[in-house]
Structures are given as C-alpha cells and as structure tokens.
C-alpha cells in the first residue's frame, strides 16, 4: 500500500509498499510466507484475512466517542460485530507532522500479542469520503475505564451517560489491588522491552482496565523502536510524552532507553498508592526541579510509613525513579520484586 505520508525512514519494512502489498492497509500480521512457513495466530472472533488486509468500512459501526485529544478521537465501535476501539488521527492539527508520526508510532505494536498490551486489529491511511482523518487504527476494546479514572474517581465516559459508575472493577484501590495492577503493567513493559519498544508515555490515563480486571497498556503514539534510534545520537524530532512522568534524562535531551518507562511506572505506582497528583505548580519550575534538584513526589505519606508493605513499596518506587537510568531496575527484576511483595502481603 503506497502511503501518502512522507515518513519512510521511520516505517517498519512490513508497512512499506511491496510487490505483494494488499490495498489500503497497514497489516497487523505478516503473511505466513514471511514468517519462515509459520502460520500467523488467528485474530479472536475476527475473520483471519482482516488481520492484515484493508479495513472493511461497511463493517465498522461507531457507537460512542470515548475521548478526544490533540491528534484525534477514540470511539467505541464494532467491527464485524466484535467490540473494538477505533482511533482516528485528524488531518487538521497544529502539527500535522507530529500527527503523522503519532499514527505510525501506534503501529509499532501492530504485530504483537500480549495480555497486557492493547492489540492492533487493522490500520489504514484510507478513510471514508468526507472524513477529516489521515489514518484509522482499529484496536481490541481494552475496557471501559482507565487506571486514571479508577484512581481519581472520574466518570468512565466523560461524554457518555452521567449515571454510569466510574469503575467497573468494583471497589477502591487497596494495596493488594495496587500490586496486582502493577504486576500487569510491568508484565506489559517486560514484553515491550523484549521487543525493543519503549512506550515513552506510560501513565494512568494510558492504562486500560478490562472487564476481567486486567490492566492493558495502550496509546503508543509516543513509542519508539530502539533499533530506529541507533543511527542517531539524538532523535530527529522532539519526543512526546507527559512531562510529569518523563524521565530526567529525556528532559535533558539524552538518549532513550527502556529505563525511561521504569521511571514513568514509578510515578504511576505512586499515584495508585497515594491517589494524589504527582506535582503542583508551574510546569517549567517542575521540569527544572526534577532535573536540577531531583524533585520527586513525596514518600512521606502514611501509606509508605505505617506498615511494612507500604515501606517496601516505597523502596520499590524510590529505586525506579532514581536520577540515573543505569541505577534503575529493568522490568524483569522489578517483576520479581513485585511478585514477591504480592505473595507476601497481597
């Protein structure tokens, strides 16, 4: 599929035009012949061809807008009768190049399958007539609620029915629940990092909670493939992400490593545990203090002081947001620590 987007240097080869290319689509799975004879896994409850072929627009039924941001909108929908989420990236934004990069970055996980990662079903740069979208991505429906909504008690669908409950998972975030969700997130990070992908915008709002009470990492619009960064000492464009969760080395313009996600996880775990916002004050003052004075959210709250589990959890957070990326744990030993903590206290 020839793409109108001038981003060939950043595109995985499987999304580039080829003799065998099918129309309209950025495939979420390679044909079997490209996988050394292996048969691609079947997409659950969807026709197999749709895993890599063009979007069948007649089978798309938008149900409800779940949210909107600077680059576009996300809808709950059905695709061939299966519940999905559809992200449409707008053409008319202040920074069209950033919108295009965000669209293609979402496809960094297009062929990946993991219980704690929102799966891409299909994607296309062709859109229905009259659409203001430069691209559409169909993803599995990861859940009605985000971790941010569970932590802070926001409505499940800000634009939906006012009477809907804020959380489908039943009850407040206990320490055991924090550990359970943390294990889900770190399992997802471990898988991503094993695929040389860094999320770079991990935060509660980008973690969905399914009806089965499983956390799934979503929104890969800021993600990077480490292999794509090896040719350059610094990225060719400003990195995205949320400043409150951005690792200090990224704020200083240094190189990207998986340890940046570990830092973001530490801020997220602190939010789960305290149910507070990480910082208050002017953005520039916070950015400067994080880099120059190692500013971090406070670990003096009673939850980190009054019990042994809380103290141990505070130690985990402290190690994960160390100023030096090299001193932070990677996802695997972090998973071991959290598993031990969950078994002991969860």
Curated annotation (Swiss-Prot):
The active site is at residue 201. PROSITE patterns: PROTEIN_KINASE_ATP, PROTEIN_KINASE_DOM, PROTEIN_KINASE_ST. Belongs to the protein kinase superfamily. Ser/Thr protein kinase family. This is Proto-oncogene serine/threonine-protein kinase mos. It catalyses: L-seryl-[protein] + ATP = O-phospho-L-seryl-[protein] + ADP + H(+); L-threonyl-[protein] + ATP = O-phospho-L-threonyl-[protein] + ADP + H(+). Residues 60-341 form the Protein kinase domain. Keywords: ATP-binding, Kinase, Nucleotide-binding, Proto-oncogene, Serine/threonine-protein kinase, Transferase. It holds the Pfam family Pkinase. The lineage of its organism: Eukaryota, Metazoa, Chordata, Craniata, Vertebrata. InterPro entries: Kinase-like_dom_sf, Prot_kinase_dom, Protein_kinase_ATP_BS, Ser/Thr_kinase_AS, Ser/Thr_Kinases-Pseudokinases. Its EC number is 2.7.11.1. The gene is MOS. Coiled coil: none annotated. Gene3D superfamilies: Phosphorylase Kinase, domain 1, Transferase(Phosphotransferase) domain 1. One of its GO terms (molecular function) is MAP kinase kinase kinase activity. GO terms for biological process: chromatin organization; establishment of meiotic spindle orientation; MAPK cascade; meiotic spindle organization; negative regulation of metaphase/anaphase transition of meiotic cell cycle; positive regulation of MAPK cascade. ATP binds at residues 66-74, 87.
């Amino acid at each position: 599929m020839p793409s109108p987007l001038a981003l060939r240097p950043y595109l995985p080869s499987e999304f580039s035009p080829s003799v065998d290319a099918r129309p309209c689509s950025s495939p979420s799975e390679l044909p079997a012949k490209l996988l050394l004879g292996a048969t691609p896994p079947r997409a659950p409850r969807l026709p197999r061809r749709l895993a890599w072929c063009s979007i069948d627009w007649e089978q798309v039924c938008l149900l409800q807008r779940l949210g909107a941001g600077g680059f576009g909108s996300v809808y709950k929908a059905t695709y061939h009768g299966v519940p999905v989420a559809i992200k449409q990236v707008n053409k008319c934004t202040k920074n069209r190049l950033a919108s295009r990069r965000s669209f293609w970055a979402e496809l960094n996980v297009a062929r990946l399958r993991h219980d704690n990662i929102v799966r891409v079903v299909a994607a296309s740069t062709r859109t229905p007539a009259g659409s203001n979208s430069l691209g559409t991505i169909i993803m599995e429906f990861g859940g009605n609620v985000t971790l941010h909504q569970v932590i802070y008690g926001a409505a499940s669908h800000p634009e939906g029915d006012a009477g809907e409950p804020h959380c489908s998972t039943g009850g407040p975030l206990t320490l055991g629940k924090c550990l359970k969700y943390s294990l889900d997130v770190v399992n997802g990070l471990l898988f991503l990092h094993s695929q040389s992908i860094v999320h770079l915008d991990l935060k509660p709002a980008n973690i969905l909670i399914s009806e089965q009470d499983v956390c799934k990492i979503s929104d890969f619009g800021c993600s990077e493939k480490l292999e794509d960064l090896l040719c350059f000492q610094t990225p060719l464009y400003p990195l995205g992400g949320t400043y409150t969760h951005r690792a200090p080395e990224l704020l200083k313009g240094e190189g990207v490593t998986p340890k940046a996600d570990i830092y973001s996880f530490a801020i997220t775990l602190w939010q789960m545990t305290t149910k507070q916002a990480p910082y208050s004050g002017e953005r520039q003052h916070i950015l400067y203090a994080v880099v120059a004075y190692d500013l971090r959210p406070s670990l003096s709250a009673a939850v980190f002081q009054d019990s042994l589990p809380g103290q141990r959890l505070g130690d985990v957070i402290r190690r994960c947001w160390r100023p030096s990326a090299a001193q932070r744990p990677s996802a695997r030993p972090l998973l071991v620590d959290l598993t031990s903590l969950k078994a002991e206290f969860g």
